[in-house]
Structure formats: structure tokens, C-alpha cells
Amino acid sequence: MSDMHAASREALAKVSSDLDTALKADNTVAVAAQAGTELFDVVEVLDGDRGLRVAVADSSKDAQQRVGLIGAVFGGKVSQVTLEILKDAAEQTWSTPREFRTGLVGLGRRALLRSAEMQGQLGRVEDELFRLSRILDRESQLTQLLSDRTQDSAARRDLLAKVLYGKVTSVTEALALQVIGRPEHNPIDDVAALAAAAAKLQGRSVAHVVSAVDLNDGQQQALADKLGRIYGRAMSIHSEVDTSLLGGMVIRVGDEVIDGSTSGKLERLRATFA
């Protein structure tokens, strides 16, 4: 969502803050989870009605007209918390109707992640989403099926639901099913982005670490502390094993890559003598 125009980024930041305030005031898992689910449902409605999608984000119309339309369409169909967030979103200025819709997706995700936070499960959800992204990276046939746009979104979600059943938290499942049904890029990157969003909500940036052997909890924490000192911010370690590295590890933080692997050193040595 970082590719939004400035006006939409400002609108999303404002409504995100208001959402946090509303959920904190109520402070119940059920309300946060319901808000997230209902916001996703609203997105489904907007996806199926282009006229409505344009009207609720039409910046040429008075803000109160847009708010009134939201009330007329969704009043009595969603919870009061969700309705107020929708009205708040409609009151803001968005660069395009598409970005308004994208903003609602982000708000739905945020509400579900807040529900996980209230249960003390946000770290677990982050880890589950990252692990799922790695599974999708390895299981190309599954990922291909989940990427098949010739299948409707319900079929793709049903397939993933069967894979996830009983293996992850309800929040992880809800987030993954939403992004598979309405993908932004591809299943691997979309699910990894959800994991990064969970880390960000905990005040951490993500370091993607590929090592020759599995890192234990102590090693991951030590690495997180070291990277935190280097980058000046708290870090969340998303690690996976690749034995082809022979030894050491490769660390990626944003666009920066630190290659400390044995295979990388050998490759650089070969290049020196080429």
C-alpha cells in the first residue's frame, strides 16, 4: 500500500489511527475480529458494484454526501464500530476509488491483527504467515493453483482453507484467505507482506535470513539485537534454511543484502580469479 498517492496515504493514516482508538476503547477481541471481517465483506460488495465503489470515494462530491451514502447502504448490515470506520473513510479525500478500496482492505487487516494482539497472538500470527509464504515458495503446484485467475475467488479460498484447517490461528487463516481471494501481486509476496505488516504493528522491521543450518531461538534473538544496533530499529527475524549455502547466511533488510554465506564467498573468490 506504499504505492498509494499522498492524499490516500494521509487518509489511510487518519482512519487507521481512528480505528485503533475505537478498538482500544472497546478492547474486546470479538469486536476487533468482527470489524476486520466486515470490512473485508464491504470490499467484496464494492468489488461487485463499480458505481457504488466510485460514488463512495468521489472527491468531487461533498464529504457528507459520501458519508450519507455509506449509512444508507451499510447501516444495519454491519456493526456500529465498522459503520463508523466506513463513514470516517468516506469522509476523507482519496486519490482514486481503487485506493479507497485498497485502504479498506488495509483497515480490515489491521483490525484482525489488533484482535490477535489483544489475544497475545500477534507474534504467532506473524510467524505463521511467514511460514505459509515459505511453504508457498516451495510448493509450486499449490501456488500455481492459488494463482489461477480462471478459478473464482471462492474456489481458491476453499483450497487454501483445506490446507490451513486446524494448523493456524483463526486470524492467520482469515488474512490468508482474503489475500488469496483478492490478490495484489502473487500468493508468495502477498502473504509475506501480511507477515511484514504484523511485524510493523509490533514496531519492528523484517530481516529475511537464509542460513545453511536452522537458527535456534537464542541465535535469532542475538541476530535481531545485532541488526537492531546496525539499523537503529527493532528487527523481526524471518528465517529459513538453504543447505546449498554450505555455511553462513544471507540477510536481506529492505533492498539491502548482506551475503555472509560460504557459497557467496566462494563465488566472489572465483570471480576474482576469472
Swiss-Prot record:
Location in the cell reads: Cell membrane
The record's keywords, sorted A to Z, are: ATP synthesis, Cell membrane, CF(1), Hydrogen ion transport, Ion transport, Membrane, Transport
Membrane topology of the entry:
Peripheral membrane protein
Q: What is its main location?
A: membrane
* UniProt cross-references to InterPro entries, sorted A to Z: ATPase_OSCP/d_CS, ATPase_OSCP/dsu
User: A single GO molecular function, which one?
Assistant: proton-transporting ATP synthase activity, rotational mechanism
| GO CC aspect terms | plasma membrane; proton-transporting ATP synthase complex
Annotated coiled-coil positions are none
Q: What task does this protein carry out? A: F(1)F(0) ATP synthase produces ATP from ADP in the presence of a proton or sodium gradient. F-type ATPases consist of two structural domains, F(1) containing the extramembraneous catalytic core and F(0) containing the membrane proton channel, linked together by a central stalk and a peripheral stalk. During catalysis, ATP synthesis in the catalytic domain of F(1) is coupled via a rotary mechanism of the central stalk subunits to proton translocation.
- Family statement: Belongs to the ATPase delta chain family.
Describe the subunit structure. Answer: F-type ATPases have 2 components, F(1) - the catalytic core - and F(0) - the membrane proton channel. F(1) has five subunits: alpha(3), beta(3), gamma(1), delta(1), epsilon(1). F(0) has three main subunits: a(1), b(2) and c(10-14). The alpha and beta chains form an alternating ring which encloses part of the gamma chain. F(1) is attached to F(0) by a central stalk formed by the gamma and epsilon chains, while a peripheral stalk is formed by the delta and b chains.
Which NCBIfam families does this one have?
ATP_synt_delta, PRK13430.1
The protein's name is ATP synthase subunit delta
The gene name on file is atpH
